[in-house]
């Protein structure tokens, strides 16, 4: 961390991937500079690289996102699976840290995830003027919700009509 800090690379425009080997001094410096961290939980397990001290980052005020790294590491690019893993992996017996809440993990996947990108002002929340950053889930078939071919969300206003989703491409 000290090495990249010497070059002035830390700051709000920098997002560090994984963050599993950060020490107390590193965490303090990330907080001071506004540097973000992207927690790639399933990737860390596949690589056997460690578990990020997520709530230490949270306590320090560091913006943390949920990431999936890449398909070769995550298998399915399934963000819901990744969110479940982040929620559960920090609930290991014997860990002294507080556990993340569902609301915290949801924030990491939405608004905090957006904050770690250059699109922070246009994604990450359902607000007027922002891109539709959402997913529709058919709870009867939740195996792979990202493969839902029935309701693609591509810059289209969505409405309900006769118990079905209707949208108009713009």
Regions found by a protein language model. Give the residues of each.
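Histidine/acidic-residue-rich catalytic or RNA/ligand-binding cores of hydrolases
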Residues: 1, 24-31, 48-57, 74-91, ...
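Histidine/acidic residue-rich metal-binding segments in metalloenzymes
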Residues: 1-36, 48-64, 121
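C-terminal cap of metal-dependent C-N hydrolases
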Residues: 131-170
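Short acidic/histidine-rich active-site segments
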Residues: 38, 48-49, 56-82, 117, ...
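C-terminal structural cap/anchor segments
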Residues: 92-142
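Active-site beta-loop-alpha junctions enriched in small/polar residues
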Residues: 19-21, 42-44, 69-71
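Short beta-alpha connecting loops at secondary-structure transitions
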Residues: 65-71, 90-101, 150-156
């Amino acid at each position: 961390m000290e090495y990249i800090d010497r070059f002035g690379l830390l700051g709000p425009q920098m997002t560090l991937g994984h963050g599993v080997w950060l020490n107390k001094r590193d965490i303090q410096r990330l907080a001071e500079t506004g540097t973000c961290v992207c927690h790639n939980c399933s990737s860390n397990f596949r690589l056997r690289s460690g578990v990020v001290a997520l709530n230490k980052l949270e306590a320090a005020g560091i913006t943390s996102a949920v990431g999936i790294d890449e398909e070769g590491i995550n298998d399915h690019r399934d963000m819901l699976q990744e969110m479940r893993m982040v929620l559960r992996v920090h609930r290991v017996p014997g860990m002294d840290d507080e556990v993340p809440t569902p609301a915290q993990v949801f924030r990491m996947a939405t608004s905090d995830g957006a904050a770690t990108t250059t699109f922070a002002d246009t994604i990450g929340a359902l607000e007027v003027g922002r891109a539709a950053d959402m997913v529709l889930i058919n709870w009867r078939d939740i195996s792979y919700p990202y493969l839902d071919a029935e309701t693609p969300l591509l810059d289209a206003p969505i409405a309900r009509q006769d118990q079905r989703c209707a949208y108009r491409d713009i």
